């Protein structure tokens, strides 16, 4: 694990993060238990949870949330306010009425392949794979896999162009 990036942004919570070289992290970020590749840029007000893998030369814009179980390939762009969801059946309590703990969640992994771009305000549901070079339009809700090179947009996201 390398040390905290050298930029001196205020009010960051960073715990147990494996940073590559030349990573820049903006102010007001929460990063814990994740891995961030070389030359990646993380904007302000971003949260990245544990067990997230982020490739090299990615750009993650402000106000984005990347939850546990997400993997971003190299050179991925994540637009402002993008959200990843990692539980297929979210609920506050168990069937017995007890408040859920981390052990109660059914985490489903999500993969965004190399050079894919997600516009601002995209929501990516758990278990989805977004293919290499795919483009997801702003505000889309991705509920199923996106093939490499496809352009999708809308709610739910639908194919608008194929390579």
Predicted regions and their residues:
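Short, basic/aromatic beta-hairpin or loop at an interaction surface
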Residues: 19
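C-terminal/domain-terminus segments
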Residues: 127-145, 151
């Amino acid at each position: 694990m390398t040390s905290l990036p050298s930029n001196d942004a205020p009010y960051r919570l960073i715990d147990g993060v494996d940073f590559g070289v030349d990573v820049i992290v903006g102010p007001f970020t929460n990063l814990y238990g994740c891995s961030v590749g070389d030359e990646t840029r993380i904007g302000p007000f971003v949260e990245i949870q544990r067990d997230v893998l982020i490739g090299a030369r990615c750009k993650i814009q402000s106000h984005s949330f990347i939850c546990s179980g997400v993997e971003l390939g190299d050179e991925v762009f994540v637009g402002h306010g993008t959200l990843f969801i990692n539980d297929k059946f979210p609920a506050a309590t168990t069937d017995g009425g007890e408040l859920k703990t981390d052990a109660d969640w059914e985490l489903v992994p999500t993969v965004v392949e190399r050079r894919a771009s997600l516009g601002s305000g995209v929501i990516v549901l758990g278990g989805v794979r977004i293919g290499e070079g795919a483009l997801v339009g702003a505000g889309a809700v991705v509920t199923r896999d996106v093939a490499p090179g496809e352009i999708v947009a809308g709610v739910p996201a639908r194919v608008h162009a194929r390579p």
